[in-house]
Amino acid sequence: PVYDHFNFDQGALNFAAGDLLARSPNNSYSPLYKYFLGSIYYLFGRNFYAVYGLQFFMGALGSVFLFLIGKRLFDARVGFLAFAGFSLYSTEIIYEGIILRAAFITFLTIVSFYALIRLRDSPTSLMLIGCALILSLFFQSRPNTFLCLPFVILYVHKYVFKDWGPEERMRGWGLFLIPLFLSFIPLLVQCFLVHDKFVFFDSSGPIAFTAGNFIDYPGVGFDTNLLKHFQKQHQMEGLSPLSFIFQQVMSDPAGFLKMLWRKLYFYFNDLEGASNLSIYLYLENSKILPFLFSHFALFSALGLMGIVLSIQGRERVFLLYAYLVCMILSVVLFHVVSRFRIP
């Protein structure tokens, strides 16, 4: 099989060699990470040490941003716990040393969140434009992150523009939304030229969605053979994703709900669902990683406790709640694997 590492690597090599479309054997994924990787190849050659070094630096910087976020929303103790938990989380460290976009998306998630809470403190023209461009990169990295957009709009309206007059609001929305949407154009054009049709950044959405939304789905992992067997057994080949879901809900609503429950269960527990690689192979063959934090359930449990304890200050943590719910849904609505959970 052709793994995602190879596709990102080949697309990056082609971009560094002059192919502005960064084509690869499989072009179904959002091309942003290929351009990030290709820029490194262009500057340093196909140097994996440069790639991993930059991704490790982004991880370290993300830890600092998490400290600042925790301190800003709660206090320095919470900030330090967030810093320590993220910087010593073995799964994140593993993905920082791999040519996959998991750590890249995680960094953009953290930076975009930090930019938004800073925007509330200093909503200058430069901050509005900068925040919009950071959000644009976050959304383009994986389109299911667009689930956050309605809540971002609500946050800006309710908390950033709260005391602004009508004319100021109009100007503010222009400074925020125009750069946000205009910055989508280059990648949308790239996707159109590569696929010969309009593609909203990522054409893998339908298969990623159906592969995790059939009644026999175990709740974790990605296996198209299981999906094909189910479709053939129930004569559901060739259906659109919505029709595929509708027929299952109508024929076995209880079974469909049980499948959703399994996905939620496996999302919050310790099992690291394999996708392109197994986290457990790295843990077994490393002398350091097993001594770091390697239990996702620890983070999910602390996160759920934090939600309950901070509910009285929900205005202060509105954006945190919104990001948390949207990032959980961005995984659970599709399929649950290790690398999708990190952000």
Predicted regions, residues:
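Multi-pass, polyprenyl lipid-linked donor-dependent membrane glycosyltransferases
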Residues: 3, 28, 32-33, 51-58, ...
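Extracytoplasmic catalytic/substrate-binding loops of multi-pass membrane glycan-assembly enzymes
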Residues: 1-11, 24-36, 45-49, 198-202, ...
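Membrane-interface transmembrane helices that cradle and orient dolichyl/undecaprenyl
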Residues: 76, 112-130, 138, 156-164, ...
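Transmembrane-helix motifs of polytopic, lipid-linked glycan transferases
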Residues: 53-74, 110-111, 115, 301-308
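Lumenal/periplasmic acceptor-binding loop at the mouth of the active site in multi-pass
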Residues: 17-20, 223-307
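Transmembrane-helix signature of polytopic, membrane-embedded enzymes
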Residues: 61-88, 106-107, 121-128, 314-322
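Juxtamembrane membrane-water interface segments immediately following transmembrane helices
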Residues: 1-22, 172-236
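Perimembrane helix-loop-helix junctions
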Residues: 118-120, 126, 148-181, 188-189
